[in-house]
Amino acid sequence: MRRVQLWAIAPTFFLMAAKKALKLAMLLLCLALFAWSTPAQAASQTSPRLEEQVLQIIRKHPEVILESVQAYQQQQQQQVQQAQQAFLQDLKTNTKAVIGESPTTGAIDSKVVLIEFSDFQCPYCAEAHKTLKQLIEKHPGEIALVYKHFPLTPIHPEAMLAAKAAWAASQQGKFWEYEDALFTQQDKLGEDLYQDIAQKLNLDLEKFEDDRILADTAIQEDIQLAESLGLSGTPFFVINGETFSGAVQLSDIENVLASVNKS
């Protein structure tokens, strides 16, 4: 398990922001070059010539690009920090709003709320799932466990489809049973498994199919929340004001729980 400060968890997020800033700076330079040209000159300029002019400006003034990237990074970091602070504050003062319609199990009315950002195709999430089951069984009446979808689709092509199937199951009150089946059979993720689990849970299959189509909005809300917090990997956990990530062990979470209960 890795204990982390929420605002220090996403170097990948800020690297992506830097790349975006660099592209933006290049675009601004190109626009500036066109603005300096007369209409006739702009029309006659060739792409290679424009590229050479841009390169000359960069060679003469590399600090302009660096300053632009740094300014953009700082702006993005400030926005993420503000979102994180607002999230943690809301978790303390308006817990129900943070939970929203997300699946919740355990001691639903507990003051100790463990929010899990997870991906059904993530192997570390599958390991963490086993630990969380042990935690809820060992500490009944102490913790409310909340599931937030964060499918990492660029590296896990089945994650979104699995998330939609689980969301559809939640509309029939079977999220946690469906979630458990997905993680238990993670090596079999695919349409056959989604249908098989639905049948074994005696779901209304017609409603299940309709709800899979409708699942995107709710899942995107979870993804947007995760991205606004600067998260870039799974699993990630927030328990009251404490945060940690990775394939956690039961003793690790219990240590965090003890710390939370003392505060």
Place the predicted regions along the sequence by residue.
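Bacterial N-terminal signal peptides that target proteins for export
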Residues: 3-8, 14-26
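Alpha-helical and His/Cys-centered functional microenvironments
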Residues: 9, 31, 65
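Intrinsically disordered, low-complexity serine/threonine-rich segments
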Residues: 16-17, 37-40, 250, 254
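Bacterial N-terminal signal peptides
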Residues: 25-35
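Extracytoplasmic thiol/disulfide redox context detector
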Residues: 40-154, 213-228, 233, 262-263
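Cysteine-centric redox/oxidoreductase cores and disulfide-bonded domains
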Residues: 152-263
